[in-house]
Amino acid sequence: MSGTVVAVPPRVARALDLLNFSLADVRDGLGPYLSIYLLLIHDWDQASIGFVMAVGGIAAIVAQTPIGALVDRTTAKRALVVAGAVLVTAAAVAMPLFAGLYSISVLQAVTGIASSVFAPALAAITLGAVGPQFFARRIGRNEAFNHAGNASAAGATGALAYFFGPVVVFWVLAGMALISVLATLRIPPDAVDHDLARGMDHAPGEPHPQPSRFTVLAHNRELVIFGAAVVAFHFANAAMLPLVGELLALHNRDEGTALMSSCIVAAQVVMVPVAYVVGTRADAWGRKPIFLVGFAVLTARGFLYTLSDNSYWLVGVQLLDGIGAGIFGALFPLVVQDVTHGTGHFNISLGAVTTATGIGAALSNLVAGWIVVVAGYDAAFMSLGALAGAGFLLYLVAMPETVDSDVRVRSRPTLGGK
């Protein structure tokens, strides 16, 4: 995965690979592992677990758009990544020591704010390093390494949890965060073109729009529709894995964390090739048909979970998450870049749409936790699946294809092979 795929020196490409690999576990947070830890070790109920999960999401929602604006303006993008990783590490170390509802809520808020740095900063560093011509392929590679990192961290967590219990999730997260700091520092400061990183597209000396004006968000119809679609996607998706983790833990109390790791590894192994293929073919195939496949798979997954609570079935269905999430992760920054290219508003727009994903995720955990308490797990899964179906229809009807037709023509293989 090198050579023509990235237009950067090998050292920078390798640093980006390691950064995406090590940040995988960090930028996603503790997620379902925290649910299992609180359920098994501290006997929390599902509603309380859903509440603290939502707190982290809400904190990220509040921080995401301002942080996107900051990433647009600053040339210290590496420092932002380092600061976020250090804060996530500190929160992960503190959670087992302060496990009350108030303490976990505060630490989840810190984690949510700190982790909101990673999506816009990584996308900006990537765009500034490779430019728009190679962005789709490099994002696919980023996501492939991200999913490989998630699978590796989950495998390590599952193995260690077998011997030391659910508390190891905090150790693994802290370790990956520290590795991400080292990877960030391996990217030379002059490797990133900060005009390209915020979505500028102009010749030297030409005037260009000022970046990060909030009014651009409300007037970009495609960006608003895409934001609504990703709210639906994450509302449907975010709570599914934590709910599966709770089911596995309830039926296998001694192996809940290890089984959750199996779920994550299974999905992440699928995501690696999916993300890479999507990144290499998104220009030729277009964004819309691929995104619709992601919505369709998510819809099916929600209903399939209700057919059995057998551990093997649940882990097997979780493989579908590898398709849906692999597609979403690779296409998400590409669509935002498509609809904001040349404006200088890439990172604030990415931050705003990431805020939409946070809204969806926070609502997902909060509402799904309440549905489980009131009506059970099957009702929660069916509700989430139905919402994914609604998102499919929204994207099908309202969202146009965003990749330029000339780009699609240039990206299609010829009869000669390339």
UniProtKB/Swiss-Prot annotation:
<feature type="transmembrane region" description="Helical">
    <location>
        <begin position="289"/>
        <end position="309"/>
    </location>
</feature>
<keyword id="KW-0472">Membrane</keyword>
<feature type="transmembrane region" description="Helical">
    <location>
        <begin position="51"/>
        <end position="71"/>
    </location>
</feature>
<feature type="transmembrane region" description="Helical">
    <location>
        <begin position="110"/>
        <end position="130"/>
    </location>
</feature>
<feature type="transmembrane region" description="Helical">
    <location>
        <begin position="224"/>
        <end position="244"/>
    </location>
</feature>
<keyword id="KW-0813">Transport</keyword>
<keyword id="KW-1003">Cell membrane</keyword>
<comment type="similarity">
    <text>Belongs to the major facilitator superfamily.</text>
</comment>
<keyword id="KW-1133">Transmembrane helix</keyword>
<dbReference type="GO" id="GO:0022857">
    <property type="term" value="F:transmembrane transporter activity"/>
</dbReference>
<keyword id="KW-0812">Transmembrane</keyword>
<feature type="transmembrane region" description="Helical">
    <location>
        <begin position="315"/>
        <end position="335"/>
    </location>
</feature>
<feature type="transmembrane region" description="Helical">
    <location>
        <begin position="79"/>
        <end position="99"/>
    </location>
</feature>
<dbReference type="InterPro" id="IPR011701">
    <property type="entry name" value="MFS"/>
</dbReference>
<feature type="transmembrane region" description="Helical">
    <location>
        <begin position="258"/>
        <end position="278"/>
    </location>
</feature>
<feature type="transmembrane region" description="Helical">
    <location>
        <begin position="379"/>
        <end position="399"/>
    </location>
</feature>
<dbReference type="InterPro" id="IPR036259">
    <property type="entry name" value="MFS_trans_sf"/>
</dbReference>
<dbReference type="Pfam" id="PF07690">
    <property type="entry name" value="MFS_1"/>
</dbReference>
<protein>
    <recommendedName>
        <fullName>Uncharacterized MFS-type transporter MT2531</fullName>
    </recommendedName>
</protein>
<feature type="transmembrane region" description="Helical">
    <location>
        <begin position="356"/>
        <end position="376"/>
    </location>
</feature>
<feature type="transmembrane region" description="Helical">
    <location>
        <begin position="163"/>
        <end position="183"/>
    </location>
</feature>
<dbReference type="GO" id="GO:0005886">
    <property type="term" value="C:plasma membrane"/>
</dbReference>
<dbReference type="InterPro" id="IPR020846">
    <property type="entry name" value="MFS_dom"/>
</dbReference>
